[in-house]
């Protein structure tokens, strides 16, 4: 897969989110999400998964890609909240 220089990878996002979790910058939506807890994060993952499904059924590929990116974001925030590493997930693929 060829990427442009402006593209953020799955690993880049995970590193960025992990950094926010460690440094806790004021006003960070990621920090607020982490502080909300696993229950809230899990509900957000379910919501985004539903939006991915609906976009796949009824919207453009661009809209679908946006919904998938949001699902990946929330899944990674949940992973960080629980202390699950990318390697742990990759071993299950």
UniProtKB/Swiss-Prot annotation:
Catalyzed reactions: 1-(5-phospho-beta-D-ribosyl)-ATP + H2O = 1-(5-phospho-beta-D-ribosyl)-5'-AMP + diphosphate + H(+)
Record-linked NCBIfam families: histidine_hisI, PRK00400.1-1
Entry protein name: Phosphoribosyl-ATP pyrophosphatase
Pathway, per record: Amino-acid biosynthesis; L-histidine biosynthesis; L-histidine from 5-phospho-alpha-D-ribose 1-diphosphate: step 2/9
InterPro entries cross-referenced by the UniProt entry: HisE, PRib-ATP_PPHydrolase-like
Keywords: Amino-acid biosynthesis, ATP-binding, Cytoplasm, Histidine biosynthesis, Hydrolase, Nucleotide-binding
Gene3D superfamilies documented for this protein: MazG-like
Family: Belongs to the PRA-PH family.
E.C. no: 3.6.1.31
One GO-annotated biological process of the protein: L-histidine biosynthetic process
Source species, domain of life: Bacteria
Subcellular location: Cytoplasm
GO cellular component, one term: cytoplasm
Pfam families, A to Z: PRA-PH
Record gene name: hisE
Molecular function terms from GO: ATP binding; phosphoribosyl-ATP diphosphatase activity
Membrane spanning stretches: none
Signal peptide as annotated in the record: none
Lineage, broadest ranks: Bacteria, Bacillati, Actinomycetota, Actinomycetes, Mycobacteriales
